[in-house]
């Protein structure tokens, strides 16, 4: 299995090995809620969203532009998730007056953004990736495994104790790295090598 045939998988492995090597030397405080690791995750997600918007501006095929715009919104949804954006905007008294708990604001914002992202992906017919086998099996399996690790770490299962938060944050970071690698490499190859412009397709409203 050469690196040239599976660049995403090897990039994934390199990121995992790097994080595993550095973890014992990093303070546990960096993994706390809203700590340094979460800021690193937000920075990575923001860069991923910007890279998708860059791809959006570089493509001419209308359906492809929808897909890149939709993926940018997907990454931004995770930015909102990591930052708890819009949660606790109002004082408790104001929230009671509106009859809605503060924490619902963040979920409402993420829901609206997710619906917009899904709409873009549907308009761009993102399932074309599956037909052309652009989505690699091995990186996706590794990605799903990391999501399982994140679930275990978040709940502190198997007596992990304080190491649970370390496992959770490292797994989340690798999930985001994997998502970016999978989309940017395979999406770029597929979406720039094929013309899918149809006369009746609409172009997204962004310039």
Task: Show where each model-derived region lies.
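Membrane-proximal helix-loop-helix units in multi-pass membrane proteins
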Residues: 78-131
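Juxtamembrane "helix-exit" motif on the non-cytosolic side of transmembrane helices
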Residues: 20-30, 84-94, 122-126, 151-161
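Hydrophobic cores of alpha-helical transmembrane segments in multi-pass inner/ER membrane proteins
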Residues: 11-15, 41-54, 106-122, 172-190
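C-terminal transmembrane-bundle signature of multipass membrane proteins
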Residues: 148-158, 167-204
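Membrane-interface helix-boundary motifs at transmembrane edges
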Residues: 2-3, 54-67, 124-135
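N-terminal membrane topogenic signal
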Residues: 1-13
